Amino acid sequence: DATNLKSAFPTQTNSEAEFAAYYPFHKYQFNILQKFLFSSNALVATQIAARGMIITAFDVLRKQMKDTELFNFTPGHAICTEAQTAPPVALANKYDTAKQILANIKTTVKGDLLLQTIHLLADSEVVYATVENITKSYISDISSYYDVKPEIEKALEILVDAKVLLVSNHHYKITSDLEGKLLEEMKDFPVELFTKKRELTNLLKDYKLFHSVASYSEGSDTFKFSVLSDQGDDLAPQGSPDLRLNVYSLFNIGDVRQDHIDQIKMSTQAKKDEATLIPENSAFDEIDKLITEVKRYQYMEDKYSNEADPNKRQIIREFRIIREEKAKHLRRKIEAAYNDATLIYLFNEQL
């Protein structure tokens, strides 16, 4: 399983003999190395064919793996180090930045080595830089995968937030200077609290989350409810004003959800024509962050919709993909919050 990567070509080692023959490398690493040497311009094409692969493999063994423990394999960052001994200044600066960022948190993951691993995979263009592939390529001890993967995930999240990495379709890449500049511009776009509250209400309408509960049939009788936000917005086709379901916004629940539930139970205990829905808010911070990010990516799309620079246009296209992915994730989180809500009616509460 350590050699089974998501890629454009088969990577899995199929026999013990093949596993042993390539040790301390994995066979697939030579495919990656060849593509990386060509795409990174580390060597010209004739050198790749004649000497590049041999020279790099020898240097990895001589410099990177000479003191390694028996049964450990060559990590991707060791290959990257010897395949590109003089990375561009901008890339070297990214390595240093990532190293400093991760050095300030409690993690065993080295920022520069993580970025080298990602650079090797992304530039090879044959193995996708997903969390799983990055982890498998980063480690030397293949038995440590499940211990290291959560640390890699945490490190990737931190470096994405720091604008060192971009993630799109679950694939990670190191940001270019232009991408970094646009991301910094996007970060400065303010998304006020009232904007986020309004956006959540609009999303609840767009999802049509409450249409199915806006009417109820009992025999030949049909009862239509007014489903309203706690600010009075209609969240479903308008029903009877005498039967109301009030839906609270995630932004209007206090720090202690149960205290809010108890307060609503007291204030509505005599209202026979009114029920109240309190969403489950354990994912509130993530939802808040996602709403902000989606609005910021949308701002960048709108601002650069007529951009003439082809490089910027390409980045904005990537931003659109990222926004769409975050919007889907946001929908799942919001729907889960309201599907797991607490319903309050006449002092009673139920999930």
Language model: regions and residue ranges:
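Extended alpha-helical scaffold and adjacent linker segments that couple domains
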Residues: 1-351
